């Protein structure tokens, strides 16, 4: 189906971070947009306020009439929705055009120059940073992001004239195989989603296949430390990057008084005195990748420097809520061992002499089963670890798999505790916290406003 000729778009799973970006895009393109989601959330309420009706029961009668025309309505669904879903079955039985979110993004990468960011971790921050640099430059861009940009208060950017589209490329369910990138960054390939891939080798092969999809004339920008071996086509350039080595890297790094600056080293043009608007150590490396992609597509040194300085970050990605001499509170979406490790290293680098406490809600039983020892090693960099029950998301419980697996593997010197998430506010109220980080991709983040209010009165 030609996206230019559809009149209505119906979303099954409209409240997902990636799905909602597409919903907003089609609304701005003048299409009738509606959808279903399992539960109301702040994001679904925002969509409703913006003019997108959403309901929360599997009810065919609730589907607007404009979305029941098989000739003019496109149905987009998330892989998390089961085939038994009543509304999905309704559309399938009647022969509607039904696509996954990634298929629609793939179509956009055929009509635009797709600047994609893939990787186990770092892709949301890197893609949002790149989109901000590009959008503020003379080039501009469209963007579909995996988080809410704090610069724009939304998860997408729409341009009236740019041929570029920045996309966070999701490896879950091999979704990124639908894309045809003009250029792509690959930040990391630490195995994840083994419930889908089965083995580390299959996971790495999926990324290898992704590199075959880069368009001729484009480029691969790949982290120096990856096990995965790329398989690029003819006329595709390859560049490497990291914090301190590769074709693109940072030098003269300065971390002091809550500020971070560095010199950007590039085969195109070095850019001295880059200041991070969100001063987090991990954003040095993310920033190098974002600047590399933006520079390769025409951004000037001044535009790179200005974009980095004004970048405010992404909600739930090293997201500071309180930052003063008495308390530091931040939330972070980290839910893979390597993400936890990067967050722990960054916060330790920023607050070397302060007590750091993490409250962590593991995400998925399979991920906890596969990586509990790795989680424990990463969390053991901190002084105190409070573990909540596993957030199941799409999964059923697995016998013997609980947060205690991580708890039992924590280093001897780490103070530790197991609590229910509902008890977190009381725990914060009754304990002294110096630097407190809320970790995980589940619903523990819903308690952050309450935790913030408690700490502000202490």
Model-based region annotation:
Residues 36-37, 55-60, 99-103, 144-146, ...:
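Beta-strand->loop->alpha-helix junctions that form or flank phosphate-binding loops
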Residues 1-100, 104, 219, 249, ...:
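N-terminal leader/targeting and accessory segments in enzymes
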Residues 25-31, 62-68, 79-224, 228-237, ...:
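Phosphate-binding loop of NTP-binding sites
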Residues 68-74, 162-163, 432-434:
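Short acidic/histidine-rich motifs immediately flanking catalytic phosphotransfer sites
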Residues 8-9, 75, 115, 141, ...:
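Conserved hydrophobic helix-helix packing surfaces used for dimerization/oligomerization
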Residues 31-38, 220-224, 357-360, 382-392:
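Short internal beta-strands
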Residues 2-8, 18, 25, 29, ...:
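Nucleotide phosphate-binding/pyrophosphate-handling subdomain across enzymes
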């Amino acid at each position: 189906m030609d996206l230019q000729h559809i009149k209505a778009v119906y979303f099954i799973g409209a409240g997902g971070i990636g799905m909602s970006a597409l919903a907003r895009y089609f609304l701005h393109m003048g299409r009738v947009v509606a959808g279903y989601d399992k539960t109301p959330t702040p994001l679904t309420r925002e969509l409703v306020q913006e003019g997108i009706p959403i309901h929360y029961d599997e009810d065919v009668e609730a589907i607007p009439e404009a979305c029941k025309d098989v000739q003019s309505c496109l149905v987009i669904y998330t892989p998390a929705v089961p085939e038994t879903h009543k509304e999905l079955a309704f559309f399938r039985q009647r022969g509607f055009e039904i696509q996954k979110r990634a298929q629609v993004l793939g179509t956009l990468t055929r009509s635009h120059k797709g600047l994609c960011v893939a990787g186990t971790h770092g892709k949301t921050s890197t893609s949002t940073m790149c989109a901000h640099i590009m959008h503020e430059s003379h080039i501009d861009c469209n963007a579909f992001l995996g988080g809410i940009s704090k610069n724009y208060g939304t998860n997408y950017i729409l341009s009236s004239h740019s041929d570029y589209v920045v996309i966070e490329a999701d490896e879950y369910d091999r979704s990124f195989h639908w894309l045809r990138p003009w250029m792509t960054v690959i930040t990391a390939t630490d195995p994840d989603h083994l419930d889908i891939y089965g083995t580390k080798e299959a996971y790495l092969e999926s990324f290898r296949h992704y590199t075959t999809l880069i368009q001729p004339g484009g480029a691969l920008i790949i982290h120096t430390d990856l096990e995965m071996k790329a398989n690029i086509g003819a006329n595709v350039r390859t560049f490497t990057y990291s914090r301190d080595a590769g074709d693109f890297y940072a030098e003269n790094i300065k971390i002091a008084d809550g500020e971070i600056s560095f010199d950007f080293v590039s085969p195109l043009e070095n850019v001295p005195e880059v200041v991070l608007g969100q001063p987090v150590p991990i954003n040095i490396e993310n920033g190098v990748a974002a600047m590399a992609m933006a520079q390769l597509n025409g951004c000037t040194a001044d535009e790179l420097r200005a974009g980095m300085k004004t970048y405010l970050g992404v909600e739930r990605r090293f997201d500071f809520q309180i930052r003063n001499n008495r308390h530091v509170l931040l939330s972070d979406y980290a839910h893979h061992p390597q993400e936890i490790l990067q967050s722990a290293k960054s916060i330790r680098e920023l607050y070397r002499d302060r007590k750091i406490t993490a409250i962590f809600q593991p995400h998925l039983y399979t991920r906890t089963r596969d990586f509990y020892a790795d989680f424990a090693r990463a969390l053991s960099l901190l002084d105190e670890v409070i573990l909540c029950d596993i957030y199941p998301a799409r999964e059923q419980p697995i016998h013997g798999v609980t947060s205690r697996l991580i708890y039992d593997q924590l280093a001897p010197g780490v103070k530790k505790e197991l609590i229910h998430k509902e008890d977190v506010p009381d725990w914060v109220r009754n304990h002294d916290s110096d630097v407190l980080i809320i970790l995980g991709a589940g619903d523990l983040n819903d308690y952050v406003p309450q935790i913030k209010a408690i700490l502000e009165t202490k």
